[in-house]
Amino acid sequence: SQAMKTVDAVRHGQCTDVQQAYELDSAQVRSSGRLHGLGAWIADHVDMSGRFHSLPIEYPVLALVPFSLPLVVPPADYTVAFGIEMTLVALGLFALLAWRAGWRAAGFFAVCMSIGAYATGIERFDLVPAGLTLVALLLAERKQWTWAYLALAAGTFLKYYPIVLMLPLFVAHLRSTEAPVRERVRALARPVAVCAAACAGLLLLSLLINPVIFYRQIATLMQRPLEVESVPATLVWLGSHAGFPMRSFGGFGSDNVDSAVAPAAALVVGLIALLALITAISGLWFRRSTLPQAWLAVLMMITIAGKVFSAQYLIWLLPIAALVVPVEGLAPLVWLAACTLTTFSFPFLWRALHGGWHGVIALRNASILVLLANLLPLEEWARWRQAVWAKVVERRRRPAGRAGVQWATQGPSQSTLSELSDT
């Protein structure tokens, strides 16, 4: 719609020339990549040129809500109204943390937001899905499972990343009682069915509004290169100092990098993230980690595993970190360092993108990895290694033990020999 085009025009912080860069026609859909011919079919059979068929180019259907609310003001004041809206969301999260976790947690959130989200906190809408992930966590801790699943479903259709939190929520729900397995599975059925129905309804709504942009969102996730702030891009930058030239270029609304080691870097980071996910979920399953710890670990995993790690992605972590991170020790200092480095790289050093500032991003990403390693129950791997080694040793000893038992049963016993010697 024309109103949403105005929104995109004035939201200069989100992406410049959004409509010019992303407005789609049939030819663009055909050239944007195919999903088994789906793109070509959509381009040939769907006409989305009418009103009320506009979706955010990178975000799911519920993102229309926070972007549409400030439309009550004149277009010239949209940016101010949007900033006020996000400020109210931030204050709401502060109050929620103060109510549920205390003033120290709320203060830690406020300090980290002031430093780490200096340029993105009220210019992006990431506070809204981050708030829903916090609400879902608090509902899960109170065992209000159906509402927790629905909060995550709403967050997922605001910005796709909360979908990964379905796994720790499912595990926590399954381990919430000591009832027999059948009763646990039966208790899961209703909340999961309600969540699946909500997701299916929102997905259908997306397809009805504009299947062309919905297809383009999926194609973008699959095709986009490594964004310069991502963890794989840091490995590419390090590889450039080892003889693998790095190429910088723009596209998909971001600055990107590429080199011969880019696929290997993405694979290595993906494997590290997978190990982190397994460790976090196993720790939650065996009750060696709390649900907030596993929640934060999974969120950190998705940030380091992705092709993009924009400055506003730090907002995803901060409400949950306020619940988990103690106010004493080194952990809060490392969090503050990560926030400072994030703001130092954007916006202050953003114009020096090709001037060598990648080292600041490398330090930020390293601090996030250190925080993730500190959060994970790494002793799980030590226990697993000891258990596997014990089984290996037991199997090696078992044949000799069986032979000795057979000899003892076949031959005369020691008492029998002594009786024979007496006679």
Predicted regions and their residues:
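Helicase-core coupling region on the C-terminal RecA-like lobe
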Residues: 224, 249-277
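Juxtamembrane membrane-water interface segments that cap and precede transmembrane helices
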Residues: 65-75, 244-262
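Extracytoplasmic catalytic-loop and juxtamembrane helix elements of membrane-embedded
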Residues: 3-12, 43, 207-239, 243, ...
